[in-house]
Regions:
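C-terminal catalytic "cap/lid" subdomain
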Residues: 1-98, 102-323
Length: 326
């Protein structure tokens, strides 16, 4: 089987894995696992970023008292993640494919050391034929430091692991040029660099997850800017993963065209790390001019006019001139 990509990250949304009543759609899970197994046989390396833990736990347990939103998320994800990963384990075992669970938090991307530790872990898994199944660790995530949703997490994973493509599976065919319920509305098949989609994006959240099309589009643009193809497609369609890689021209989806040229690993990390800045460096105009030049240069103390915050070696800081970010 000839395929378009050989290294892909696949994000499976809650609305793909959950039925209308919130229970886990095992039939859909099984179909997606079968497709991943088929891609593996064709030589494709796959990382799964799977939602569904909270939705799975919600249908499994009835709280004995009223819980706030944080308590609900922690309880449902703790119960649901065990159920979810066990189901993946059983389904992939039928194909003789080992899987490994990777639970992460947004804080784990905040330092270079933790970032590289995660990367090395998943690299070893892939090298040994293990499919990483990634999800946010909702049981310990602090609300202020949570991912917007697993769309954001999938973008950071695809970037960190230097994947050729990120496939975001939702319950719709892609981004439409109007309301999907309006007759004649069509899926936007390609999004070129710089194309404005603001008139087409609806801000509704998904039924069982925290995300929506606005988040998907924002993440897709950022990842595509780093040279990675991003595809938004319908995960409830039969054979969707195989069709996307084997028959890309005939398969309905929205494809974000990647920027040309590669981006270094460090720059990819920094691109997704604005929220992790520990402090600010305010520079004079000459220092800013030098930093924006084509050559790789070091920032000298003489160019710094003010320092804010507390930070250490390898921490991320914001560079400013006046009130503007550089």
């Amino acid at each position: 089987m000839a395929v378009q990509f050989t290294r892909i990250a696949v994000k499976i949304g809650s609305n793909v894995l959950a039925r209308k009543d919130g229970t886990l759609d095992v039939t859909r899970m099984s179909a997606l696992v079968d497709q991943v197994a088929e891609l593996r046989k064709a030589g494709v390396e796959v990382i799964l970023i799977s939602s569904g833990a909270v939705a799975s736990g919600r249908s499994e347990i009835k709280p004995s008292k009223k819980l706030d939103s944080v308590e609900q998320r922690q309880l449902f994800s703790a119960v649901g993640q065990a159920k979810l990963i066990n189901r993946y384990y059983e389904l992939f075992r039928e194909h003789g494919i080992p899987v490994g669970q990777v639970l992460t938090t947004k804080e784990s991307f905040g330092t270079r050391r933790h970032y590289l530790n995660q990367r090395n872990c998943m690299m070893v898994m892939l090298e040994n034929g293990v499919i990483p199944i990634v999800n946010e660790n909702d049981t310990i995530s602090v609300t202020e430091l949570m991912f917007t949703d697993n769309d954001e997490l999938s973008g950071m994973i695809a970037s960190m692991m230097d994947m050729q493509a990120l496939i975001i599976l939702s319950n719709i065919d892609g981004i439409y040029n109007g309301s999907p319920s309006t007759p004649g509305t069509q899926v936007i098949r390609e999004v070129e660099q710089g194309k404005d989609l603001s008139d087409y994006i609806q801000t509704e959240k998904s039924g069982f997850g925290r995300g929506g099309m606005l988040t998907k589009t924002t993440i897709a643009r950022k990842v595509a800017d780093e040279g990675i193809t991003v595809i938004i497609a319908n995960g409830k369609k039969d054979h969707i993963l195989v069709d996307l890689l084997q028959h890309p021209a005939e398969t309905v989806c929205t494809r974000f065209i990647p920027a040309e040229g590669g981006v270094s690993s460090v720059k990819k990390w920094i691109a997704h790390s604005e929220g992790f800045a520990k402090g600010e460096l305010h520079l004079n105009e000459q220092a800013v001019k030098v930093l924006k030049g084509q050559k790789a240069v070091s920032l000298l103390p003489v160019g710094v006019v003010r320092i804010e915050g507390e930070f250490e070696k390898d921490d991320i800081v914001k560079i400013k001139i006046g009130r503007a970010h550089v």
